[in-house]
Each structure stands twice: as C-alpha cells, then as structure tokens.
Amino acid sequence: MIDVDALSKKYPAIKQMQAYEPIFWKNLNYKKEAELPVGVEHIFDAEARFQRFAPYFEVAFPETLPTHGILESPLLKMDKMKAVLNAEAQNQVKGDLYLKADNYLPISGSIKSRGGIYEVLKFAEKVAMKHGEIVYGDNYAKLNEPRFKDLFGQYGIVVGSTGNLGLSIGIVACKLGFRTSVHMSSDAAQWKKDMLREKGVNVVEYNDNFTHAITEARKSAEADPMAYFIDDEGSYDLFLGYSVAAVRLQAQLKAQNIKVDAEHPLFVYLPAGVGGSPSGVAFGLKKIIGENVHPIFAEPTHIPSVSLGMMTGLNDQISVYDAGIDGVTKADGLAVGRPSRIAGKMMDTLLYGIQTFDDQKMMKNVAELHDSENVDVEPSAASGFTILDDVQAQLEQDYPMENASHIVWATGGSMVPKNDMDQYVAEGHQVK
C-alpha cells in the first residue's frame, strides 16, 4: 500500500491535486545528463521503416498519395487563436503560436497514427521476413496482395486503448490481414468503437478504466501463442514511432523559416495520458532539434497520472486512484490513471515540466479554435492551448520570450463524427 499522507507531506502539491486545482510541476532534473536505453540511431531506424512502407500506404490507403505514402501532418500558424487567448489571458503568449495538426494525420486522424501504426508495421515486416516473403530492398506495395493477408491472418494483434491507439492499430492491422482485437475502457467514445467494428476489428468493451482494459488485453494475448500484444504502458516501438515526428517537424521549421536557438526558444505543449506518445515526441525533439526546444506536458486536473508519477519518483508504481483522485475527464484520450513504465524514466531529464488544467477551460478552447481558425479537434487535443496562460509565467523566469515560438500539439480530431464535434463546440460555447 502507498502511504499517500506521508507522500503529500513530502510533496505538498499532492494536496492541490486531490482538490483538483491546476498545478505546475517543474522538473528539477531537466537538462541533467542521463544514460538512455535508446538513441538518435533508433529514431532514424524507425524513420527508414516508415519510408520502406510508403509504397504500401500509397496502394492500401490512397489518402496518403499526396504525401507519397508518408504519414505526416501540417504545421499551422495560429494568429487568430493567439489573439483570442491573449484577450483572456493573465500571461500573454509572446512570439508566434503554431498548431502541429496531428488531427489531420491520415488513416486515423490522431498522433497515434505515429506510434500505433509503426509498431504494426514493424511486426508485419518481421512476420513477412520470417516467412521469406520480403527482403529490405523490395517494393512493400506487394504487402497489399491477398497472399499476405492470408499469411498475416494466421497472427493476432491485441491492444488495450481508451480510443485513438486502438483506432490507429485496428485500422492498419485489419487492413494488412491480422486478426485484430482492441480492448476498450469505459472512457472510449462510442464512435471509435463503432468505426473499429465497421473495419472488422473485434472490440472488447469494459465498464471499467484503462488499467483494467489493458490488463485483460495482455491476458488474452498471453493465452494465444500466435497473438502479438502492443503494450501502451511500456513499448519502446510505440515510443520510437512517435519520435520520428521530430525529424519531420525539423524540416517544417526550416521550410517556414522558424528559427530555434538560445534567443528563439521553441516550446512544445503535448497532451499526456499514459505518457507514451508525448514522451516519444519529446525524446525525438530533444535528440533531433536540440537544447533550445522545451517540451511541456498537459494533463487534466482529474487524472494527472504522469505528473503524480514523476513528482513522487514512483512513476508507474502509483496511480491517481491511490491518491483518491477520481480519474473522470472529458479528455477521453487522456483518461489513464497509471503512467507508462517508460514515460517517467525517459522524461526524467528531457521534460521541462507538466501543467494540469480544468476540463471546462479545455472545452472552451475547442470552441475557440473552431470559431477562430476553423480547425476542429477532439477535447484532449485542445489542452495545449488550455495550459498556455499558466505556463507562460513559469517560462518567463527561465527564457527570453519575445522571439519564442510555441507549438501546441493537436493530438486528434478529424475522424470525430459531425454530431459529436457540434456537441463539443456547443459545450465550449456555454463556458464563460
């Protein structure tokens, strides 16, 4: 049992967390030296694998033709949204504000297209090579042929998800021919479950939280010798799939003449649930773009799992439920009570800090983004905007802000059905 009273004496911010007050946790280990189990070479290995699969995506998912089979999203300037936010803020955003629009990523419309799809590709390549069906120099478009569907159909892919990870893995694994099961927690949006079933995925629903769903998913995979389990709580393949985003972002920064140096720092605001995708992206940013990019996570006040884990140093050994925090949030993609086994360890020296936020403010930002920039995102994807005001006060103590650039990472949204999106916007309009 975890002695929460003793912990909260040592870390007084836990009391604020228990009262659902927004907090900023500053990482005192930021920028210290650390030995990490993966490095820049692993990022480029993952990028090369995405390149090998590009011809497959062009034939299997024609929506990727405009980007030649590469799954990437635009970097959009947010001048109107910045003006809206600054009109309400106590702490003005100085410099330029951008949206990394992973809500527009092809195939599954979320950041999970990066890590989730990558791990499926890596497994598919391994299986095809094991059976002598492909070599590295082949044109991978042939993986769309019926004989590969028959081969992959002998294998299962299993994952536990609150929604977007299941969507990305389910769509691609099923298309390749794998028997695919997605175990979903009670937080998962109905439309995500419906879409997966339409694609032929076996959706297993639980009237319980993510930790329960992923535990059951793991058990079911262990019981099937031909099943491969994708572990959102501890997979380095997922992590590295996300990290490739940094290679692509670096090129976008150059194309848009966005300077990144000591006088022009770059701040990147990433929503965190289990912490895998923002950690993978943050790792990539620090390894590829370097010391003048500063990642910051955003978490709901009702489920601050990564901040609780990192603040106490307990990481995945503590869940928000241990601290009596209810874990209820409208940000379904962030509804994970226990952080990933690798997020806290990998982020120990690479993450500037974490800001928690109020759900109502997030819903307001969903509506403001819709109204000002005509960009639709699901609630959790707006949370980078939600934390801007609070975080600026912290950043100004450490960095020159006049010429800074800020990137809010929009983690999902383009697949949201219109009725659901209209409801999110209407709810946001109600918030004063």
Curated annotation (Swiss-Prot):
Task: List the cofactors.
Answer: pyridoxal 5'-phosphate
Report the GO molecular function annotations. D-serine ammonia-lyase activity; hydro-lyase activity; pyridoxal phosphate binding
Catalysed reaction(s) here are: D-serine = pyruvate + NH4(+)
Q: What is its EC number?
A: 4.3.1.18
UniProt keywords, alphabetically:
Lyase, Pyridoxal phosphate
PROSITE patterns tied to this protein:
DEHYDRATASE_SER_THR
Q: Which residues carry this modification: N6-(pyridoxal phosphate)lysine?
A: 112
- Spell out where the chain crosses the membrane: none
Read off the InterPro entries from this record: D_Ser_am_lyase (IPR011780), Ser/Thr_Dehydratase (IPR050147), Ser/Thr_deHydtase_PyrdxlP-BS (IPR000634), TrpB-like_PALP (IPR001926), TrpB-like_PALP_sf (IPR036052)
Name the family: Belongs to the serine/threonine dehydratase family. DsdA subfamily.
Q: What is this protein called?
A: Probable D-serine dehydratase
Organism this protein belongs to? Pediococcus pentosaceus (strain ATCC 25745 / CCUG 21536 / LMG 10740 / 183-1w)
